[in-house]
Regions:
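Intrinsically disordered, metal-sensing/regulatory segments
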Residues: 1-259
Length: 259
């Protein structure tokens, strides 16, 4: 039990806070020109985790496939509604069009900053629960879920940091608050562990819910941002980074199985 708890804490900490710290480093070093590549990488990681790992694991259980497909459908609708409520999709446009999207006055910037932090916290809690469910199914699946969360949060946190720095002023203050919001992933992971323990029959459904969240974010959020008129070379780079995301998750899971 202790090992499982610490494994979940480490996995959710890397995914939640790690993504914020990496985003801060990349925002300073790479700026916005590599954001599109990160979006492609994240989309590939999310789709690979959902379709190649989480869903197959869920359907290997004795749960009725009809019930799992219904859960997948309801999950997609649920995340769509959260998106509309600006809790899940709270600011996924951040960082992709700063000049037009973030041209707010000082008051609205401050309000937007707290909206971003609230949305990040809700999002992080949900991620933590789903990562915990993956770890409790098997270790390699938990690693895949953590990598997917890490990958798709990095480009979003790069945008979030820009909004928070504008609304809260100092860069360190913005980074600290975003790290605290990302740390809610650990809280979600612990809550998930203690809720699921003794109720392992829920695991297939939680894996499907995790899949629906990953598929929704990839197809409704990330990939539409890549649908622009680009040259053949730029389009090829998008595809290569998408495949790199798929390969990254696949290699990570395979390595965990081998070791």
């Amino acid at each position: 039990m202790t090992i499982s708890v610490w494994t979940i804490i480490l996995g959710t900490l890397c995914a939640g806070v790690g993504s914020v710290l990496i985003a801060a480093l990349l925002a300073r070093a790479l700026m916005a020109r590599f954001t599109q590549h990160l979006l492609s990488l994240a989309a590939g990681a999310l789709l690979a985790t959902a379709f190649l790992h989480l869903l197959p694991e869920a359907f290997e259980s004795e749960t009725q496939p009809h019930s799992l497909f219904l859960t997948l459908l309801l999950g997609l609708i649920f995340f769509f509604l959260l998106d509309k409520a600006e809790l899940w999709h709270h600011g996924h446009e951040h960082g992709h069009d700063h000049d037009s999207s973030h041209d707010h006055d000082t008051g609205s910037s401050l309000t937007g900053s707290w909206a971003v932090l609230t949305g990040d916290s809700v999002h992080a809690f949900g991620d933590g629960v789903l990562v915990a469910a993956a770890f409790m199914t098997n270790f390699s699946l938990g690693v895949a879920a953590s990598v997917a969360v890490l990958a798709h949060e990095i480009p979003h946190h790069m945008g979030d940091l820009a909004v928070l720095q504008r609304g809260l002023g100092q860069g360190r203050n913005a980074l600290l608050k975003l790290c605290l919001a990302g740390g809610v992933t650990v809280v979600g992971g612990l809550a998930g562990f203690f809720l699921i323990e003794g109720h392992e029959a829920w695991l297939p459904f939680l894996l499907v819910i995790a899949s629906s969240s990953y598929v929704y974010v990839a197809l409704a959020d990330l990939i539409p941002q890549l649908q622009k008129r680009l040259s053949a070379a730029e389009t090829a780079m998008q595809v290569l980074w998408l495949l790199a995301g798929i390969a990254m998750v696949t290699v990570a899971v395979h390595w965990m199985h081998v070791h």
